[in-house]
A protein has these predicted regions:
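Glycine-rich FAD pyrophosphate-binding loop
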Residues: 10, 24-67
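Conserved N-terminal helical subregion
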Residues: 92-194, 201-207
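Conserved FAD-binding catalytic core of PHBH/FMO-like flavoproteins
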Residues: 80, 167, 180-286
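N-terminal FAD cofactor-binding segment of flavoenzymes
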Residues: 62-107
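Beta1/beta-strand and adjacent pyrophosphate-binding region of the FAD-binding site
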Residues: 2-15
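Conserved Rossmann-like nucleotide-cofactor binding loop
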Residues: 15, 42-43, 157, 188
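FAD/FMN-dependent oxidoreductases across multiple families
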Residues: 255-348
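C-terminal helical "tail/cap" subdomain of flavin- and related membrane-associated enzymes
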Residues: 334-424
Length: 424
């Protein structure tokens, strides 16, 4: 059985669902003519129960934050507003943070060898939002469906691109025809592979450990990040007073830490954080995922485009992965819209414009994150002194500091006008 569509988006994560909703919101395709295809599409779930560590069960009672959280920029917030996602997010699972403090192992938080960003200095209400991962996923699926996207649960088996269109064979025997296919199926994208697009990159030989902790001192609506020789530790503020940790460390250290009991792990976080928030109590299990740098050598083919992790996977140290992917969606929609209603959605010209814009922006971001990881993981004493001096210099140069903050907010850079936030 064959079904004819305008666009097929492969991947039903936040990036894929936002891509579909945005195409419909911008009137680039008609309701019922855009499909989101994935082997499994999550259905919105009732409020979750987080399995607490037994010794900390009482402390974890309350808002059931998902273990995975996202740090979203102002530009991402604006894009989610346009797609109808933002207003549907549960308020108690979205938390605005007002400050960010970054410091080197040899320095102190808010002191020597540290760098602090404050929303008040930028004239902004906040620096961004910490958002529950499952809540965001659920609402993005809802928004895509509400906008008129067809949700299809099936694995993609083959992609055949011709001058006239794209034929997509599904594992259940169905076939889809479209003018454009968009791969949003993650770093291990099957669609990218079927399109014959190669990737490059390297592994960091690191894992990212994630968990939620309760701290003796209030987080003060601040995202804290300390750079250690084995990788950075971030403490991200949650609405219930707890913090979500993202600890990037070597594979060997990751195995050691995951083998610790809750008290031992909490003690390790306390030491690694330099005691910035006082005593630590672990309130959830600890999960982990491997870290690598990967980028597609091409973002587009005739009648095909990559967005999100299918195009680029970066180090999580600055929490920019999803923000970059959402900007891909906005930029692709902008390029398709600039081509005019008469142009075919699969025309190569608009797709190449998208590639030129986002490839350079994403390369800058990936190179910067890779460079930071290498710089702060070096144990060379000379480089350590350079790091501390560099953080201090950036902190004293207000125009440099402001420029970095504005870029992270999505206020600066090659950002589509319809999502570009403007400072008050």
């Amino acid at each position: 059985m064959s079904r004819e569509l305008d666009v097929v988006v492969v991947g039903a994560g936040p990036t894929g669902c936002v891509m579909a909703a945005l195409l419909l919101a911008r009137n680039l395709a008609a309701p019922g003519r855009v499909a989101v295809v994935a082997e499994r599409i999550s259905s919105p779930s009732p409020r979750r129960e987080v399995t607490a560590v037994p010794e900390a069960a009482a402390a974890s009672a309350g808002i059931p934050w998902d273990l995975r959280v996202f740090a979203l920029s102002r530009a991402s917030q604006r894009l989610l507003e346009l797609c109808g996602v933002w207003r549907s997010l549960p308020p108690d699972l979205v938390f605005p943070y007002e400050r960010m403090c970054v410091w080197d192992e040899s320095g102190t938080a808010l002191g020597r060898g540290s760098l602090t960003f404050d929303c008040a200095e930028l004239g902004e209400p906040d620096l961004g939002f910490i958002v529950d991962g499952q809540a965001l996923q659920d609402r993005c699926v809802q928004a895509a469906g509400a906008a008129g996207a067809v949700l299809i649960e099936a694995a993609v088996q083959a992609v055949d691109v011709t001058e006239r269109g794209v034929r997509i064979a599904l594992a259940d025997g169905r076939e889809l025809g479209a003018r454009l296919v968009i791969a949003a199926d993650g770093a291990g994208s099957t669609t990218r592979e079927l399109l014959g697009i190669a990737t490059a990159g390297h592994t960091y030989h690191q894992d990212a450990l994630v968990a939620h902790v309760r701290t003796a001192e209030p987080h003060r609506s601040t995202a804290w990040q300390r750079f250690l020789p084995t990788g950075p530790l971030a403490l991200l503020p949650l609405s219930d007073g707890r913090s979500s940790i993202v600890w990037s460390t070597t594979r060997e250290d990751s195995e050691r830490l995951r083998a610790l009991d809750p008290r031992g792990f909490a003690a390790a976080v306390l030491e690694a954080s330099g005691g910035v928030l006082g005593d630590i109590e672990l309130t959830t299990p600890v999960a982990s995922f491997p870290i690598h740098l990967q980028y597609a050598l091409d973002y587009v083919r005739p009648r095909a485009a990559l967005v999100g992790d299918a195009a680029h996977a970066v180090h999580p140290l600055a929490g920019q992965g999803l923000n970059l992917g959402l900007l891909d969606c906005a930029s692709l929609a902008e390029a398709l819209g600039e081509a005019g209603a008469a142009a075919s959605l699969g025309d190569y010209g608009p797709l190449r414009r998208y590639e030129r814009r986002r490839k350079s922006e994403n390369f800058i971001a990936a190179a910067a994150l890779d460079g930071l990881e290498r710089l702060f993981s070096s144990s060379n004493p000379g480089i350590a002194r350079l790091r501390a001096a560099g953080l201090g210099a950036v902190g004293s140069l207000s125009f440099v500091k402001r420029g970095l903050a504005k870029r992270a907010l999505g206020i600066d850079g090659d950002v589509p006008a319809f999502v570009k936030a403007q400072s008050p």
